[in-house]
Amino acid sequence: MKAAADRLMAARAREGRTRVLIVDDSAMVRQALALGLSTDPRLEVVGTASGAEAARAQMAALKPDVVTLDLEMPQMDGLTFLRSYMESAPVPTVVISSLTRTSGETAMRAMEAGAVDIISKPSLGAGQGLPAIMRDVCARVWAAARARLALPDGAAPAPVAPGASEDWIHALGASTGGVQALSRILPFFPAQSPGLLVVQHMPEGFTAAFARRLDALCRMRVREAADGDLVLPGLVLIAPGGLRHMEIERAGGVCRVRLVAGAPVSYSRPSVDRMFLSLAAAAGPRVSAALLTGMGRDGAAGLLAIRRAGGRTFAQDEGSSAVFGMPLAARDLRAAEEILTLDDIPARMMLAAAADTRAPSLASND
């Protein structure tokens, strides 16, 4: 009788848990991920697979809510496998990959194929830091399972002719779903738009590949930011992933990038909040900033600081967000003067810069 009751309680405990399938050719990595993910009560590891064919069978049998996928596997590589099931039976997928230059480029193609997030494969020798790493992995896998797999269809936004002065600055912050969102909207900023700064939550090393992919798509030049870079018209600077925060300082009438050490903020480094807060101090009323799709709260407080400094602030709406977490936090703080569809954000940012007007006061929205 007690055994039956225990089974019933266990079954009830599993209800509502996110079902995870782990796909990796390394038995050691599969075991480490399974153990780590199982520490989160929201997650249930329902299976593991060493390659594409085994994974395909388990996906059909187990119906996972989310897949973690290694890109470098024998027989069929992870990218080819991802493309195959995203076309026929899409499942939210988190790429968990070791970093090489080749894997960075492949990871970007995986995001274009529909993967929701990229995580650098945890080092099994991380020692005391491994639990913190796995907490972040658990949170991102859980969030990925809730992400929309495709942006809503819609007409592409029309480019807006630049009309702002050279010292205006645009800024964007994003997390889960941000690679796809940024790839969609950045090409619509004209070549001589005001300098544009981006923090996208991404592991160390992958942002360089992301910048190269965007540079091929965009009218503006795009590259990974370096310490001391000037914020210039026509240039998009992507915060390097993983190790440091990107802040902006004004000196001698110009704004420069500073890459600074510091603990993660809202579990993130680089942090959107750190960039936005520095922009509020350095450029205040000559900033237009938008907070895009992502889990958590990073960026909401910084967006509010920009608004209070007289800058123009926007957030992505729920309908076009893969994960409506960061924009929701901004809405709850009343940090965004407008909540917009993703496709409307470039035009509104450019119009705000061209008008060069201060944001409406917070009191005006009461």
From Swiss-Prot:
Domain notes: Contains a C-terminal catalytic domain, and an N-terminal region which modulates catalytic activity.
Signal peptide: none
Active site: S175, H201, D298
Gene Ontology CC terms: cytoplasm
Function: Involved in chemotaxis. Part of a chemotaxis signal transduction system that modulates chemotaxis in response to various stimuli. Catalyzes the demethylation of specific methylglutamate residues introduced into the chemoreceptors (methyl-accepting chemotaxis proteins or MCP) by CheR. Also mediates the irreversible deamidation of specific glutamine residues to glutamic acid.
GO aspect biological process, one term: chemotaxis
UniProt entry tagged with the keyword Repeat: no
Name of the protein in question: Protein-glutamate methylesterase/protein-glutamine glutaminase of group 2 operon
EC assignment: 3.1.1.61, 3.5.1.44
Localization in the cell: Cytoplasm
Similarity section: Belongs to the CheB family.
